Swiss-Prot record:
HAMAP family: Azoreductase_type1
Family under the similarity heading: Belongs to the azoreductase type 1 family.
SUPFAM superfamilies to which the protein is assigned, alphabetical: Flavoproteins
Cofactor binding summary note: Binds 1 FMN per subunit.
Summary of subunit composition and partner proteins: Homodimer.
EC number: 1.6.5.-, 1.7.1.17
Single annotated GO MF: oxidoreductase activity, acting on NAD(P)H, quinone or similar compound as acceptor
InterPro entries for this protein: Flavodoxin_fold (IPR003680), Flavoprotein-like_sf (IPR029039), FMN-dep_NADH:Q_OxRdtase_AzoR1 (IPR050104), NADH:quinone_OxRdtase_FMN_depd (IPR023048)
The UniProt record lists the keyword Ribonucleoprotein: no
Stated name of the protein: FMN-dependent NADH:quinone oxidoreductase
Entry-linked PANTHER family: FMN-DEPENDENT NADH-AZOREDUCTASE 1 (PTHR43741), FMN-DEPENDENT NADH:QUINONE OXIDOREDUCTASE (PTHR43741:SF2)
């Protein structure tokens, strides 16, 4: 039995191209893995706060008294990290917005990147503290960017996830969705077929 965490990051609600892919993954996984638990976190519907000068102080080891906002941020960070660590398969939607990931997903990453919790530094360099996970990235793009210099999303996600210890990372792309209705449907269908292959593997 596996535990699966699905993190949605689109801000477009019913107009999203990535949410249908996440929903398709959930349906396919439940169909083929009847006893597995799936947790869904929708950052578009329930965003996490952006770190500022006050909140970032709550995430660093310190004996200082925390403000109410800091305490809330620390508790949320603990909950998000606990959720991440409790699951075996991690699925992130990552639509490309202006060549980058959504700010809501970046805010989430900022809350789970905790020194001495998800990574730590030693004399040998950074040590990864998130173990035995595999991740799937569902990334949608208006244009065609895969394997080009404009695909900053793939590089960033591999770098960030690898830094905390998630090195088994697969990507499924739906590209050219702004090239017209037929192109969007084709991109969705191809991505859903790739999801089916991932789920069945």
């Amino acid at each position: 039995m596996s535990k699966v965490l699905v993190v949605k990051s689109s801000i477009l609600a019913t107009f999203s191209q990535s949410n249908p892919l996440a929903d398709h993954f959930i349906d396919q996984w439940r169909e083929q893995h009847l006893n597995d638990d799936i947790t869904v976190r929708d950052l578009g519907a329930q965003p996490v706060p952006e770190l500022d000068g006050e909140l970032v102080g709550a995430l660093r080891p310190s004996d200082a008294t925390l403000t109410q906002r800091q305490q809330q941020a620390l508790e949320l960070s603990d909950a998000l990290i606990g959720e991440l660590q409790a699951n075996d398969v991690l699925v992130f939607t990552a639509p490309m917005y202006n060549f980058a990931i959504p700010s809501k997903l970046k805010n989430y990453f900022d809350l789970i990147a905790r020194a001495s919790v998800t990574f730590r530094y030693s004399e040998q360099g950074p040590e990864r503290l998130v173990k035995n996970k595999r991740a799937l990235i569902l990334t949608t793009r208006d244009g065609i960017h895969k394997d080009t210099s404009s695909d900053l999303v793939t590089h960033y996600l591999r770098l960030f996830l690898g830094f905390i210890g998630i090195t088994d990372v697969s990507f499924i792309y739906a590209e050219g969705v702004a090239y017209g209705p037929e192109a969007a449907v084709k991109a969705q269908e191809e991505a859903k077929a790739s999801i089916q292959s991932f789920v069945s593997a």
